[in-house]
Amino acid sequence: MIHAHTRLIAAAIACLVLGPGAIALADEATAAVPDQPSALAPDLPAAVTPPAAPVAPKPLSRQLANVRKPPPEPSIFSYTEAKGNALKIGFAVMLLGLLVWGWQLEDSGQSRKWRRARRVAIGFLGVMGVYGWFNYGKFHNGNFVHVWEHYHYYIGAKYFPELRYARLYECSATAEVELGRRARVASRSIRDLAQTNLIGPTDDVLANPERCKEHFSEARWQDFKQDISFFIGRLGNRWPDSQKDHGYNGTPWWNITGSILANLIGPASERSMFLLALLDPALILLMFAGIWWAFGLEIFAVAATFFAVNFPSRYYWNGGAFLRYDYLAWTVLGICLLKKKRHGLGGALLATGAAFRLFPVFFAVGPALQAGWRFFKERVLSAEHRKILVGAVVATALLVPASMVVAKGGLELYSEFAQNTEKHAQTPLTNHMGLRTVISWRPWDSAKHLKDNSLNDPFQTWKEHRIDNYERLRWLFIALNLVFLWGVWRTTRDEPAWVAAALCGVVMIPAATELTCYYYAFMIPGAFLMEKRREAGLWLILLAIGTHAITRMPIWDDDKYMWMGLASLAYGWMLIWALLQPKAAEARSPALAPALETAGASGRRRR
């Protein structure tokens, strides 16, 4: 009875948070897992069953009756990825038109003309932007939960004290052997997370099962096997490929929340995955509510539209996962709080976002550059920077000891995390983006030319070439980063702290880091800079539309993501250029224009 009530509550939450499309998902979450004998059956002969009674064959004409019928035509209202992308881009173009029209009216002194209708339309497009990221309720072709992601982050967080960063695939294989599937483990390859980070055979794992089991108590090992059994069945024929991904990479600070929730929610099940997957949508809704509160309707609509349209960070990658967007929510909300002059709490959230995924630290670097410059000039920190610093220090002071308690380890935890981070930094991926990807790219060294299926890791040669290319031009990478950093400092040194935070993150993360494509939702704060230059929002939407244009190019994925990364770098430099223009040429903020016009009219009346 209790479980029935739990399922009903989960269904209600899904309907409220995710919309009508979640009704079917709630039904799925309360249903039993479908039988998958091909995935779960151990390597044992099947039981002998008595032969079934012979059934008389149907006449041939009846057998062919259905074959002759053509398949039904899909409804014009049926959802496909192509239709969804077209709808998102169509809404984006409509928003561009509304914004430009509104700004023309403001510049001509007619800001009140159609104002209510324009605001309603812009608000509608903003809401559809948020909804559009969820593929308008279709999620992963009707499946809300990203099971692959839950395997990595639910298992990785729940058993982090035993697995750490190097033993996820090794221990999964050891557990699978004890589940009666030794032959299947022996016949496939897994990624070696501990040593080479390359894909290879499982011989060493099979020969040394105690290497994994010595880290578990007997009770925890049985729980682990039960959870692995669930994911083997749930992933089905995708399970072998899941063992070739890149493991669990949550930071020690993210692991605080991840580990506590994964252990509290109970064994891996449809219900537990569904409930954990609800957390990201709730945070995303909170994030966009914060944007509307801090920056107003137009900027909310631009940010939401970018989120929906941007191809690299689409729902496909991390939608329906376990807390993969918390870093984004805390970082964006931190900037919103800086805008509303809640500097202490804003600094705490910026520090939290950085701790949860590392690269968001560049959003905090902007205010830090300001603080350093002003201290150099005035020998004192401003009040806003003092509050930001205090908030960040308090958050860090809480997160560091908590991470060691949850991980049941000491300072060696951070050494292991640093090694894991360095390992991934030296592992090029076909969906990497950023300046390093651009510098290491060569048209003759693409995956199309270097992929070798005769190797255990078909991309090994391609990776080696990428690393060599980067090492030859490392000096250029450093020099360009210094130029970008100078541009950020020069642009924001006398601006409010929120401007420095937004610009530094949007510019420096593509320049200084090499991230997988799905993190590029971090570009959302580019919309905030419409407060200073309204074209910043137009360029951001055009950037998102441009990523779809790049996908139409007849090239391989590594080339496509290189071009998307280059476009993101260009957007950052365009922001610096625009903000460096003389103040007299600066466009009025969309949020401030009506107020300025009203003030001007009042002045004329007084005269």
Label the model's feature ranges.
Residues 302-308, 348-353, 500-508, 537-549:
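Central hydrophobic cores of alpha-helical transmembrane segments
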Residues 348-372, 510-522:
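Transmembrane helices and adjacent periplasmic/lumenal helix-loop junctions
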Residues 530-607:
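Aromatic-enriched
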Residues 2-17, 22-69, 579-607:
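Short, intrinsically disordered terminal tails adjacent to the first/last structured region
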Residues 2-20, 25, 29, 365, ...:
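Cleavable Sec-type N-terminal signal peptides
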Residues 58-336, 340-343, 368-517, 580-592:
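Primarily membrane-embedded glycan-assembly and transfer machineries that use lipid-linked glycans
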